Amino acid sequence: MGANTLRRSLVALFAAAISFGAITHAQAETLRIGYQKYGTLVLLKSSGALEKRLAEQGVKVQWTEFPAGPQLLEGLNVGSIDFGTTGETPPVFAQAAGADLLYVAFEPPAPLSEAILLPKDSPIKTVAELKGKKVALNKGSNVHYLLVRALEEAGLSISDITPVYLPPADARAAFERGSVDAWVIWDPFQAAAEQQLQARTLRDGQGLVSNHQFYLAARPFAEKHPEVVVALVDEIRKTGEWTRANVDEVTAQVAPLLGLSPEITRAAVERQSYGAQLITPEVASAQQKIADTFSDLKLIPKRLSIAEVIWRQPDKVAQAQ
């Protein structure tokens, strides 16, 4: 074998080795998704559609459940997940804390799927009567903003009440014991409290907040794997469309997963919104208003720019779809 022939053979062999290594790495790639007790991601997880779609790209899927949005985004911040869903407020607090996240997509408004609840025998009739009362909520969650806006509407501020910051399970226990006067919560915990405890709705989000669900990604993952992000959002959208058209089937499928009755599950399903899409300028502007509100209240340490953390789909990925 001549020197040139040997050189060409070695180059070809080296190229093949690199190619094989890249393929092996791609096959070992794992998309780590954080989800909560209820939502479109729960349905997507149970369907297996995402695993099937991403298998074509050599990507595996790993799912991790979190009790609420703030905890989920802490997982994203420390690198234990790549993608997840929360309400409007958690990403504001996470960004203020330095989390390297990107807003990827959102669901349409669902203002009825969060509310300020009262015990069935509570004498409280208006939000103004919460002055001086103990109100349970998950700090930095979507209902934190609902509470702020509801208090503003009633001429009060967060300093006029005693917030009791608890995750959903602990907040429900405190609510049942009578340790708090009100509980601000989202579905399916909201529907469960209404039907199991006969909790009364003092104020929901209608006419007050949008209550968008956001899908967020760790910036390094989204920038390295835009094609995975696009495929994921597409599967979320398809799952939402199917859910909207098949409420009975979804209820039967999800109730056992949640450990809730069909009646409670159906109430939550019907109040949820469906139709995931990439972030629009209008939604980014609304989210900026929320961030400014928490900054003005000194609940976050600095002003934020939401525009700086919006994921932009690369043209090459869009053209490939």
Q: Where are the language model's segments positioned?
A:
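Pocket-lining segment of extracytoplasmic ligand-binding domains
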Residues: 89-90, 163-164, 168-256
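Secondary-structure end/capping motifs
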Residues: 224-299
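Small-molecule pocket liners
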Residues: 40-41, 110-116, 199-200, 211-215, ...
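C-terminal segment of classical bacterial N-terminal signal peptides
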Residues: 17-26
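Twin-arginine (Tat) signal peptide motif
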Residues: 2-11
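Short, glycine-/small- and polar/acidic-enriched structural segments
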Residues: 29-157, 164-165, 181-185, 207-209
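Conserved C-terminal helix/tail region of periplasmic/extracytoplasmic solute-binding proteins
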Residues: 292-321
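Short, solvent-exposed loop/beta-turn-alpha elements that line the ligand-binding surface or hinge
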Residues: 51-58, 276-283, 306
